[in-house]
A protein has these predicted regions:
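Blade-level signature of beta-propeller repeat domains, shared across WD40, Kelch, NHL, RCC1
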Residues: 225-228, 240-268
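Repeated scaffold domains used in trafficking and secretory/extracellular systems
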Residues: 56-70, 102-117, 155-165, 201-210, ...
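Alpha-helical segments with a strong preference for the paired helices of cellulosomal dockerin domains
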Residues: 273-295
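Short loop/turn segments immediately following beta-strands, especially the blade-tip
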Residues: 39-43, 86-91, 138-143, 180-188, ...
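Conserved beta-strand positions in repeat-built beta-propeller and related beta-rich domains
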Residues: 24-32, 75-79, 118, 123-131, ...
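Structural motif
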Residues: 32-38, 81-85, 129-137, 176-181, ...
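Beta-propeller fold detector
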Residues: 46-54, 93-101, 145-153, 187-198, ...
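An edge-strand/N-cap motif at the start of beta-rich repeat modules
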Residues: 18-44, 267-268
């Protein structure tokens, strides 16, 4: 009996102190209809796959945005103004709405990665070709546009990944990592490219995500061999970025041939042993089962 009580106490302690690493949601551009994937930072596996195209809305080759506001995971389409809110842990559908703008925007620009800052959705919008300047699109959480910044005279600035890290706005293009600046000229953005080391040449850069609690910046990329997740250390003074591999995503369940154009971080809840976003009796039972054989 004493041994059983000790085992229960150990399990309860573990329940409150573990399972707090977090999750990264990834887009999967390159199939139709596309899907999104959840990478579990604790287990190192792709453990959830969600197919938004099955819900009856406009289908897309790239469901992206993947921004978390503390309650919902926001998902956007590359080719339509539809926006979705999902359960940030399970990916279950919650609601749908749309940008309050003409869908003609998508005739010349795509929408890609995004983030939420101070109650606004920031989104990377590359042109269909280099003759159209890249755009940083800003809207309210309800989808009402508030601003747009254009990479004028910078055909190299076609943003894909986008993330705020403190007061620094970072974007990726297919081949570079840049820190955005806003000159005095209205509605224009510029950028300084950081010297990125660690990512092999030939990789196409994709989404960015930031874990503020762990001060961890993540980058996803892909080449002909599959997709890779990186952790990036920034040196703003030297304008450098050093990438360290976290995982070969393709070896962990992310399909080969897809491009992770968007990345979104969601914090884990302490004690959530089964990774569903809820802390309940099922989590305690899972911990008891996992450690019961050693008691």
């Amino acid at each position: 009996m004493r041994q059983l009580i000790a085992c229960f106490g150990l399990s309860a302690l573990l329940l409150t102190s573990v399972y707090a690493d977090g999750y990264l949601w990834l887009s999967g551009a390159g199939e139709f209809p596309a899907r999104i994937f959840r990478y579990n930072l604790r287990t190192g596996q792709i453990d959830r796959v969600v197919a938004p195209g099955e819900w009856g809305f406009v289908q897309s080759r790239d469901y992206n945005l993947l921004a978390y506001d503390g309650n919902d995971l926001y998902v956007g389409l590359e080719n339509d103004r539809t926006l979705l809110k999902l359960n940030p842990y399970t990916g279950a559908f919650r609601s749908a709405f749309a940008y309050q703008m003409c869908n003609c925007f998508y005739g010349h620009h795509w929408m890609k990665d995004g983030t939420i800052r101070d109650g606004e959705i920031w989104r990377a919008a590359p042109g269909h070709n280099s003759s159209s300047p890249g755009i940083l699109h800003v809207s309210t959480l309800a989808g009402s546009p508030t601003s747009a910044f254009y990479g004028m005279n910078r055909p190299d600035l076609q943003p894909i990944g986008l993330e705020w890290v403190g007061d620094a706005l970072l974007i990726t293009t297919a081949s570079g990592l840049h820190r955005v600046n806003f000159p005095d000229e209205p509605l224009v953005f510029g950028a300084v490219e950081y010297a990125l080391s660690g990512v092999p040449s030939g990789h196409v850069l994709g989404g960015l995500a930031y874990d503020p609690a762990g001060d961890a910046l993540y980058l996803a990329s892909a080449d002909g061999n599959g997709a890779t997740l990186w952790r990036v250390q920034l040196n703003h003074d030297a304008q450098t970025a050093t990438a360290t591999p976290v995982e070969s995503l393709t070896l962990k369940g992310y399909p080969a041939g897809l491009q992770p154009t968007a990345l979104g971080w969601v914090p884990a809840r302490a004690g959530d042993a089964n990774d569903d976003g809820c802390v309940d009796d099922a989590d305690l039972l899972e911990v008891l089962f996992a450690f019961g054989s050693g008691c």
